[in-house]
Amino acid sequence: MSGFVIANLNIKNPDAYKEYVDKVVATIKKFGGEYLVRAGEYKVMEGEWKNPRTVVIKFPNYDKALEWYNSEEYKPVKPIRLANSDGNMIIIKGVTW
């Protein structure tokens, strides 16, 4: 069962955030992750969507997503995101039918 990282972000400093984008991809790939959504056009259909940037990353399983988030590889990259954006992030298990 896949694991997903879902983040909804407001980028406060786009120039500095670019460093995060450049560095995070290799860490995601190392743990078998792939981007499904990375910003892009959207339309809010119901409720409120607080931040303009949404990211969805798929990992082979839930544990791999957690392993990536807590990894030594992601550890030095994470503060760049935190310093240059506000928002929410979850790691969630996918379903199988």
Where are these regions (language model features)?
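C-terminal structural segments of small proteins and small subunits
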Residues: 66-68, 72-90
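Short S/T/G/P-rich N-terminal loop/turn motif that feeds into the first structured element of a domain
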Residues: 1-54, 58-70, 93-97
